């Protein structure tokens, strides 16, 4: 009996001495309990926080959106074969989206040590129950808490909620047209920003580089390395641009500031039919346009051909070279070069390996004294010409069709199909984890349909016509052929009469001389 009393008193003392112990800070209420899942579990308030705090609206962020997608997929049974371990692994991977390593490690620790609570919240029937796990793991921040920190404890209003959750809707309906900025405001902001960057580079280059690189850490583990590599490649030319040019010039090159017109370009407008008093000075390229641009194009074209035809001057090589030469001329002259090749290629083939560039351009009437460019309607060829496909003309037509034809045939190769399949599966990797398996399964099942669709779309003839490489015969524009000037040009000289097929007309009606005397003229 004495032993029983001693045992009873000992148990009673132990029970009175050790109640359900909780940390002292838990007495501060839900502000402390619901900071995260660890604090709620320590204060034994997980259910309270889940129903009263964590299910409330949250601030929009990338980690929060990814976590909510994963939680919704786990709770709705998108992958019915997933085990509890698979679900916890998916949730733990979302912790890697947090910006700092410390917060990411704490999130993973909470998932690992409070897995039962995480699975319990994911098994909830309500959508708010599923999303509450993201707030518990600090992947989502409660909207009320965010506003309390940024507005000095000011109570939440509907205007504040609109500003945080959907700032683009707070001032009216969504518009895809940006609001009009005051004139010069963008230029002023650009100049101010470039000036600050130049000051930072001059004062401390290492600090500026480190500051820029630190921004990559907020992009998540998958993109941080790519971001840093990009910055390393772009930082040196950006630094040279910033240090070598004044802020105004940098912003003008970027299109943020309008280019100032020089005072000598100012001209007085004509009034009542009186011509302008000051003539505008044209730019260099405009002077070339007025002083025989077509002749310059021809000379550049033939000189480039000479460089490529030193060892071999066959007609096949010349024709092939004509298709490539327009890629090396200056950008403003590319279109004129293409037109030149289409129109004058037969004459160039005949003359290329025999005469100098100046003689070539002079012979086909592109260079010379007061001669304008003309379009020759017939080729001066001594050999019979091959039949021409009326619908597939153009210097790049055959090359375009050969290229696309080979590409279409390569679609049947196993290696090409494997590369296409890997490319499509690579696109699946950017999706949230629950959808990756479904995307890969879709690509594998529909691979034959995708390949056949690509082959159907890559019809060489149709694609080359759409790109303009193949086209029908082009009619010379009125005014580009000197022969349309009539007898005043035909009968100017025997060469002009022969060129315009009007030798007999000039002899009979204008010159009224025998053919023998005409041929004797110099």
Curated annotation (Swiss-Prot):
One protein family per Pfam: SapA
UniProt keyword list: Disulfide bond, Glycoprotein, Lipid metabolism, Repeat, Secreted, Signal, Sphingolipid metabolism
SUPFAM superfamilies xrefs: Saposin
Chief localisation class: secreted
Cellular compartment(s): Secreted
Every Saposin B-type domain range: 60-144, 183-261, 291-371, 393-474
Residue positions the entry lists as glycosylated: 204, 312
Propiece residues: 18-59, 146-183, 261-290, 371-392, 475-522
GO CC terms: cytosol; extracellular region; lysosome; membrane
PANTHER family, alphabetized: PROACTIVATOR POLYPEPTIDE-LIKE 1, SAPOSIN-RELATED
Role: May activate the lysosomal degradation of sphingolipids.
Protein name in UniProt: Proactivator polypeptide-like 1
Encoding gene (name): Psapl1
């Amino acid at each position: 009996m004495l032993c029983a009393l001693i045992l009873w008193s000992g148990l009673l003392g132990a029970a009175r001495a050790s109640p359900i112990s909780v940390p002292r800070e838990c007495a501060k209420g839900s502000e402390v309990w619901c900071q995260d899942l660890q604090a709620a579990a320590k204060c034994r308030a997980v259910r309270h926080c889940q129903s009263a705090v964590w299910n409330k609206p949250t601030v929009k962020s990338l980690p929060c959106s990814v976590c909510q997608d994963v939680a919704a997929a786990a709770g709705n049974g998108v992958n019915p074969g997933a085990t509890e371990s698979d679900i916890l692994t998916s949730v733990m991977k979302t912790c890697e989206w947090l910006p700092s390593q410390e917060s990411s490690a704490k999130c993973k620790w909470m998932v690992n040590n409070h897995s039962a609570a995480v699975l319990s919240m994911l098994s909830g029937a309500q959508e708010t129950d599923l999303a509450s796990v993201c707030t518990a793991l600090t992947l989502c921040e409660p909207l009320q808490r965010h506003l309390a920190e940024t507005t000095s404890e000011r109570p939440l209003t509907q205007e504040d909620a609109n500003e945080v959750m959907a700032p683009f809707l707070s001032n009216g309906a969504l518009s895809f047209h940006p609001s009009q900025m005051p004139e010069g405001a963008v230029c002023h902001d650009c100049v101010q920003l470039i000036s600050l960057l130049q000051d930072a580079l001059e004062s401390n280059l290492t600090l500026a580089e480190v500051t820029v690189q630190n921004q990559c850490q907020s992009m998540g583990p998958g993109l941080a390395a790519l971001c840093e590599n990009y910055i390393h490649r772009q930082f040196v030319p950006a630094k040279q641009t910033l240090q070598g040019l004044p802020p105004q010039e940098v912003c003008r090159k970027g299109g943020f500031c309008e280019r100032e017109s020089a005072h000598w370009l100012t001209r007085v407008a004509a009034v009542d039919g009186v011509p302008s008093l000051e003539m505008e000075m044209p730019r260099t390229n405009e002077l070339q346009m007025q002083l025989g641009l077509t002749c310059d194009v021809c000379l550049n074209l033939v000189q480039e051909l000479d460089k490529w035809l030193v060892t071999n001057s066959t007609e096949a090589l010349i024709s092939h070279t004509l298709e490539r030469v327009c890629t090396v001329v200056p950008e403003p002259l590319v279109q004129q070069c293409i037109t030149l090749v289409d129109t004058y290629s037969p004459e160039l083939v005949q003359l290329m390996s025999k005469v100098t560039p100046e003689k070539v351009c002079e012979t086909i009437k592109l260079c010379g004294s007061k001669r304008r460019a003309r379009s020759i309607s017939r080729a001066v060829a001594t050999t019979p010409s091959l039949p021409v496909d009326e619908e597939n003309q153009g210097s790049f037509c055959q090359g375009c069709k050969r290229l696309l034809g080979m590409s279409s045939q390569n679609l049947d190769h196993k290696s090409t199909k494997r590369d296409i399949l890997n490319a499509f599966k690579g696109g699946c990797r950017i999706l949230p984890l629950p959808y990756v398996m479904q995307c890969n399964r879709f690509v594998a099942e529909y691979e034959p349909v995708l390949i056949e669709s690509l082959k159907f779309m890559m019809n060489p003839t149709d694609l080359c016509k759409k790109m303009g490489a193949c086209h029908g015969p082009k009619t010379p524009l009125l005014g580009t052929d000197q022969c349309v000037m009539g007898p005043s040009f035909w009968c100017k000289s025997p060469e002009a009469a022969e060129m315009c097929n009007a030798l007999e007309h000039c002899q009979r009606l204008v010159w009224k001389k025998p053919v023998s005397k005409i041929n004797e003229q110099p």
